[in-house]
Design a protein with these regions (language model features):
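Beta-sheet-dominated scaffold domains
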Residues: 2-147
């Protein structure tokens, strides 16, 4: 998957096929074909999200990828289910307010022991918050900031 800074064209997140390509039908559905090229066609996701200028917010574990979209003030998870705003689970206003006002880095990390995605906002609120898949929410706010 490729993350772009801002929405470009129809989508800002794209899947790039490897060793295959896609042929599109008139209805927009794709047929995947074999190809000798290492990288195939970029297929856009139907979303309005991008990683803004904060690639350091990206973290992944197993089949899930997490990142922030500062421009839209959201935290996102990309998985087999598609793109989802995990910031909507109890922290929508917090991220709308604090991501947009963040002037520096937005650090993302994944804690494999606790199975949590951590987001650190050092300049706007000087703390970290963690998203947990097991409760589908944000169980903790931490006083440390990831470096």
């Amino acid at each position: 998957m490729v993350k772009q800074a801002l929405k470009i064209g129809r989508a800002s997140c794209r899947e790039i096929l490897t060793n295959k390509d896609a042929l599109f039908n008139a209805d927009g559905s794709a047929n995947v074909t074999s190809n000798n090229a290492v990288l195939g066609q970029a297929i856009p996701y139907n979303s309005n999200y991008g990683i803004s200028t904060n690639p350091e917010s990206f973290a992944d574990f197993t089949y899930r990828a997490y990142f922030t979209d500062k421009k839209n003030g959201v935290v996102l998870r990309h998985s087999a289910d598609g793109m989802e705003e995990v910031s909507n689970y109890g922290m929508k206003d917090y991220f709308k307010d604090n991501l947009r006002s963040q002037t520096g880095y937005i650090y993302g990390s994944y804690d494999e022991k606790k199975n949590q995605y951590n987001v650190s906002l050092p300049t706007s609120v000087n703390n970290s918050v963690s998203y947990s898949e097991s409760i589908n929410g944000w169980p903790s706010r931490k006083s440390f900031v990831t470096e």
